[in-house]
């Protein structure tokens, strides 16, 4: 068994748990977690959250105290601009989500996270997660890879917004994430692509012709 922070965790049947659990699968894509590390990591995802469509997972000005794993459902992250809401990202089944700047800096969030459908999530407390990161190098490596992937995605998106036409941005998104057009309302996609809804509708219509 493994003893850590007054927890005693048996390691029997860890193999079957790993094979079935998508959280462990995602971490193992980035780092070679041992069975003990996998078991410990999984034991802290204890908070279950259920959201209805339009419910908020995180609100602006509130501190982000959790990292979430989406079991089912679709959510959007948006910035509450005075003139209009600016969609900055979306998350789906089997992915992680949080108000990232707030989670990392331990400061109030500037963003809202809202359910676009019925959602079921698991959550780990921020303090518990960073204890794991600080005490287990394999978990720290996986977290670093997740952060690096997010940073690369942000840079690539910024370049697309600055250099591509609205039509080209649409085509890139369709190629990269075709599922978004089935899961997310068109007005939010238009906001994410920094284009008018009418332009998005026109490009969508043109794509269907081809």
For the regions a protein language model found, what residue spans apply to each?
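A cytosolic small-molecule/anion-sensing beta-strand core signal
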Residues: 52, 71-72, 92, 117
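Cyclic-nucleotide recognition modules
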Residues: 86-145
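Short, Lys/Arg-enriched N-terminal segment that forms or immediately precedes the first helix
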Residues: 150-159
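Short phosphate-coordinating micro-motif centered on Lys-Gly-acidic
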Residues: 57-62
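Cyclic nucleotide-binding regulatory module and flanking cytosolic helices
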Residues: 5, 10, 14-48
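Glycine- and acidic-residue-biased ligand/ion/polar-headgroup-sensing regions
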Residues: 65, 69-76, 94
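Phosphate-/nucleic-acid-contacting segments
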Residues: 9-10, 164-210
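Short beta-strand segments in beta-sandwich/barrel cores
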Residues: 56, 74-79, 96, 120-121
């Amino acid at each position: 068994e493994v003893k850590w922070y007054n927890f005693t965790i048996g390691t029997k049947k860890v193999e079957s748990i790993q094979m079935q659990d998508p959280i462990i699968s995602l971490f193992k894509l980035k780092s070679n977690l041992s069975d003990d590390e996998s078991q410990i990591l999984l034991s802290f995802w204890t908070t279950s959250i259920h959201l209805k469509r339009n419910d908020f997972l995180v609100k602006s000005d509130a501190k982000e105290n959790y990292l979430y794993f989406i079991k089912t459902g679709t959510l959007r992250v948006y910035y509450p601009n005075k003139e209009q809401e600016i969609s900055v990202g979306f998350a789906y089944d089997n992915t992680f989500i949080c108000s990232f700047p707030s989670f990392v800096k331990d400061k109030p969030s500037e963003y809202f996270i809202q359910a676009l459908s019925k959602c079921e999530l698991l959550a780990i407390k921020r303090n518990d997660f960073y204890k794991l990161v600080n005490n287990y190098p394999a978990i720290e490596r996986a977290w670093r890879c997740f952060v690096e992937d997010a940073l690369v995605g942000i840079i690539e998106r910024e370049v697309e917004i600055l250099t591509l036409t609205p039509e080209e941005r649409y085509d890139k998104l369709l190629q990269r994430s075709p599922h978004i057009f089935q899961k997310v309302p068109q007005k939010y996609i238009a906001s994410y692509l920094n284009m008018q809804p009418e332009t998005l509708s026109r490009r969508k219509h043109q794509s269907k012709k081809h």
